[in-house]
UniProtKB/Swiss-Prot annotation:
Its cofactor is Zn(2+). Belongs to the class-II aminoacyl-tRNA synthetase family. The gene is thrS. GO terms for biological process: threonyl-tRNA aminoacylation. Its main location: cytoplasm. CDD domains: ThrRS_anticodon (cd00860), ThrRS_core (cd00771). It is found in: Cytoplasm. It comes from the Bacteria. The lineage of its organism: Bacteria, Pseudomonadati, Thermodesulfobacteriota, Desulfovibrionia, Desulfovibrionales. It comes from Desulfovibrio desulfuricans (strain ATCC 27774 / DSM 6949 / MB). The keyword Zinc-finger does not apply. This is Threonine--tRNA ligase. Residues 1-63 form the TGS domain.
Amino acid sequence: MEVRVEGQMVEGQAGDSVAAILQKALSGKKFKAVVAARALDSAEELLDLSSPVPAGCTGIEPVYADSPEGLQILRHSTAHVMAAAVKQLFPKTRVTIGPSIESGFYYDFDVEKPFSSEDFSAIEAEMQRIANAREPFTREVLSRAEAIERFKAMGEDYKVEIIEGIDADTVSVYTCSGFADLCRGPHVPHTGFAKASKLMSVAGAYWRGDEKNRMLSRIYGTAFADEKALAAYLKQMEEAKRRDHRKLGRELSLFTFKEDVAPGMVFWLPKGMLVRTILEDFWRKEHLKRGYDIVQGPQLLRVETWQKSGHYDHYRENMYFTQIEEDAYGVKPMNCISHMLIYGNELHSYRDLPQRYFELGVVHRHEKSGVLHGLLRVRQFTQDDAHIICAPEQLEGEILEVIHLIRDLMNLFGFEYKVAVSTRPESSIGTDEAWEMATSALVQAVEKAGLPYTINEGDGAFYGPKIDVRLLDCIGREWQCSTIQVDFTLPERFDLTYVGQDGERHRPVMVHRAIMGSLERFIGILVENFAGALPTWLAPEQARLLTVTEAGDEAVSSMLEEFKALGIRAQADTRNEKLGFKVREAQLAKVPYILVVGEKEVQAGGANVRLRNGDNLGLKSVAEIAALIRTDAEEPFKQGGMRYSFA
């Protein structure tokens, strides 16, 4: 048989392993970096290197350890190595599940005494011993009955429960270093690939995410293809700790959380609410400028409405429900239904299209307690949600305009970003023709915008394909942000129409889009990206006046009024404290302009200007200081099509 590998044809024999074929095509160095392979046939399945080449396979694509797919496999294998180490050290531990996740892996254990970070050194040492031994991952296929019998004999009740819930005649089991685990695979060839690993944290997690079940001990870890990549990641994580928005939000008095009262929901403090209000006001003005109408829908809609939309069938696990008198209601997890009902409130002509509805809408989505994370993962949040209802021939142009809005926002904050087009998932509604037309419109708009993009197969919404935009912050982390979704199905379900030039009724198409996504999440990202030192235009306090002695109180009071009249957010610190102490407090509060008023400054009618980074600009008049702050606040807006105005 002949098999194509990276552009060359390789001769092989029936029954040859994937490894045997790859060794003929790749150099020794390249082959050593391969963790698995993809069979390029109709199934395109991932294979272990020890697997035989499937019959009829025309090509094999090697999966390298440092590729996104390779890292996922490597991390999953390292989770097995960690579980093997834990079982060696703590034999009475029962194992549950251990998947790879975005930046690493975890494994949940049922253990008498929950693990702590103090256990890490022993577990990591055992993991390194296993890695150094380069023990193979071996795969065997068992009948369900055989697998149940084996795991029962091992005392692994959780694995038995999982197997009993699998609707298949056979299951696969992988073994490394004497540890057998139920797993689909594939896995790395041997444990030596798990050398560049690190345990990161511990947490509690309920079995199957159900609070009624037993609390398990979860160990998080990460792994990379080499020590250099691991070291770079650990350095990034140290910087991330310094920038953690939960820590900075507390230190800067922006927001707080009360987990005992409202888990997954934010309490905005005055300074944080000011930041949010500034951002919201700017964003509303920007949308009005771009032809959007601002609307608002109710928080509760009858359950029948969510059944009609399809959300009840496809999304109800993420929704909250309540009862009012005899009727069941769903708390809205998104705003699209209200916007369609607003559109349907009156008859529309083709001359009215496109209709662009914008809402800073509060939504609620049920997230499991284990995944809640400050502002970044909450249960109540505000979406900068818009729905564009247009004629099919207007679709591509409208998508392009949304892409331009995303680009302008990213440029405003200096973010680089990545674009992906997500296609039809397995669970979906709508016709094949509608999905193809919608996907084509998204791809063409992205290409017209000149943006590089990738395809995420099967990752679209249940009602339509989408564009996902992930921004990159200053330390290289990616964050899911903007989304554009095309929907032919919901306008059909809610019987949306417009009167065309021919006098007949026609069906419009709808674009769902959010640019910041969740305002809470976006503010959390901004706080971390700028390490709390928000851009001057967004800072809750743009300037702080500091007196040296009581003699400066009157002058500071007068300056404060002048700044406020000019729309500059300024405060005064006239406490009887040492100047150095007050300067340090202003710097810790990330105030952009620190204005010192002593005897000399009082006589000159100005202030000594210090920046939060420590630079000293010397004595300036109130007018000069106001001009500095204005210029600084307006600077980010010069690059794009957005505008900033002082209140």
